[in-house]
C-alpha cells in the first residue's frame, strides 16, 4: 500500500508538470497517470513467491540443480518442455509471474484475467523481454506462454520494438515511476524494520536518514526533534521526510529525461540519477542493508527455511502430476 501511495504521488507530480509543459494534452489521459501508477504498484509484486527473492532463487535452483532437472526430459505421455519453457523455469521471475496471473485465463475464470487496462499491465513489466535474455540476473518480463499477450499490448500502446527474436521492447514510460516507488519504499522499509528489530541502533538509523539532507535541512530537523522527543516518532518523521525528498528527486529526473524515456534510450533507473547528496546516502543505505540486514542471522534463517519449504512443495506437487501421467500412459 505504501508503494502504491508513493507511486500515486510520483504519477500526480509528473502529470502536473507535463500538463504545464504540454498544455495541448489537457484532454488526454495524462491526469490519470497517478491512478495508473498506483494500480501498477499494487499489482507488480502479485507474482512473487513466498520468501520473496530467495523464493525465486529456490524455484530456479530446484529446476536447474535440484530434483526438478528431470522435467527437462521427455515425460511418460510423450510431452516435453520447449527450450524457452525450460528457460522460464530455471530463471523463475516474480514479475513475469505477476504478468501471467494478471492476464491468463485460468480454468473456470473469465477471459482477460484481472481485466486491467493495457497501460496498467505494461507499467508493471520492468523487463520487457523474454527469459532467453535474462542473463545472470534472471530478470525478464513475461513467460513464453504470455509472449503473445505482451506483444499485443506493446503493439497497441506503440512500445518500441528493439528485437524480434528473442522478443524485446523498450519500457513503457510509466515503468520508471513504478520502479522508483518500489526503490524508495523498500529501501526505507528495510531501514525502519532493521531499527524495530534492533539490528540497527537509534543513532545508526538517524545517521543513515539524516545523510540525505543538506546541512541547513539537518539543522531544521534537529530543532524539530527538540519538540518531538519521542525517538520512534523522530525516526518515522525522518523516514517520511526522506521519502518526500526522493519523490521530488525522481520526479525531476523523469522530467529532465522526458525525451530519452519516450524514445526508449534512457538507461538505468530514476533513483540512480538523483542529485549527488541523496544518491550517496541511498547507496550507503543499500550497502548497510546488504551487510547488516540481509545477512543477519534472523533473515538468513528465514531464507533457509523458505528454500527447504518451497523445494519440498515443488517436489510433492510435481510428483503428483508425473505419477498421474505415468498411470494414464500405462496400457490397460
Residue ranges and their predicted role:
Residues 2, 176, 180-183, 242, ...:
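Charged, amphipathic alpha-helical oligomerization/scaffolding segments
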Residues 224-272:
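Long, amphipathic alpha-helical stalk/connector segments used for oligomerization, subunit docking
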Residues 1-39, 46-238, 247:
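Sequence-structural signature of the catalytic-core scaffold of metal-dependent phosphohydrolases
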Residues 255-325:
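Substrate-recognition/cap regions that form aromatic- and gly/pro-loop-enriched pockets
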Residues 169-176, 231-242, 270, 294-305:
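Non-transmembrane, amphipathic alpha-helical segments
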Amino acid at each position: 500500500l505504501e508503494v502504491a501511495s508513493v507511486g500515486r504521488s510520483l504519477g500526480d507530480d509528473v502529470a502536473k508538470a507535463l500538463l504545464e509543459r504540454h498544455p495541448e494534452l489537457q484532454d488526454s489521459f495524462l491526469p490519470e497517470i497517478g491512478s495508473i501508477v498506483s494500480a501498477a504498484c499494487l499489482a507488480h509484486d502479485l507474482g512473487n513467491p513466498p520468501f520473496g527473492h530467495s523464493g525465486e532463487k529456490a524455484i530456479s535452483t530446484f529446476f536447474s540443480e535440484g530434483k526438478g532437472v528431470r522435467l527437462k526430459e521427455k515425460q511418460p505421455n510423450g510431452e516435453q518442455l520447449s527450450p524457452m519453457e525450460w528457460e522460464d523455469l530455471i530463471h523463475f521471475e516474480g514479475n513475469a509471474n505477476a504478468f501471467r496471473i494478471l492476464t491468463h485465463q485460468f480454468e473456470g475464470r473469465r477471459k482477460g484475467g484481472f481485466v486491467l487496462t493495457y497501460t496498467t499491465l505494461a507499467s508493471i513489466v520492468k523487463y520487457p523481454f523474454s527469459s532467453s535474455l535474462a542473463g545472470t540476473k534472471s530478470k525478464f518480463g513475461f513467460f513464453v506462454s504470455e509472449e503473445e499477450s505482451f506483444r499485443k499490448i506493446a503493439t497497441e500502446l506503440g512500445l518500441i520494438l528493439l528485437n524480434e527474436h528473442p522478443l524485446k521492447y523498450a519500457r513503457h514510460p510509466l515503468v520508471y515511476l513504478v520502479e522508483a516507488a518500489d526503490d524508495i519504499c523498500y529501501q526505507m522499509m528495510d531501514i525502519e524494520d532493521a531499527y524495530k528489530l534492533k539490528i540497527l541502533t537509534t543513532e545508526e538509523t538517524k545517521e543513515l536518514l539524516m545523510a540525505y539532507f543538506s546541512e541547513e535541512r539537518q539543522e531544521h530537523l534537529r530543532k524539530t526533534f527538540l519538540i518531538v522527543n519521542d525517538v520512534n516518532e523522530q525516526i518515522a518523521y525522518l523516514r517520511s521526510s526522506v521519502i518526500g525528498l526522493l519523490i521530488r528527486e525522481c520526479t525531476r529526473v523523469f522530467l529532465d529525461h522526458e525525451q530519452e524515456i519516450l524514445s526508449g534510450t534512457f538507461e538505468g533507473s530514476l533513483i540512480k540519477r538523483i542529485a549527488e547528496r541523496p544518491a550517496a546516502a541511498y547507496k550507503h543505505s543499500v550497502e548497510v542493508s546488504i551487510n547488516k540486514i540481509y545477512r543477519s542471522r534472523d533473515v538468513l534463517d528465514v531464507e533457509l527455511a523458505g528454500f527447504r519449504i518451497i523445494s519440498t512443495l515443488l517436489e510433492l506437487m510435481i510428483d503428483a502430476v508425473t505419477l498421474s501421467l505415468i498411470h494414464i500412459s500405462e496400457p490397460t
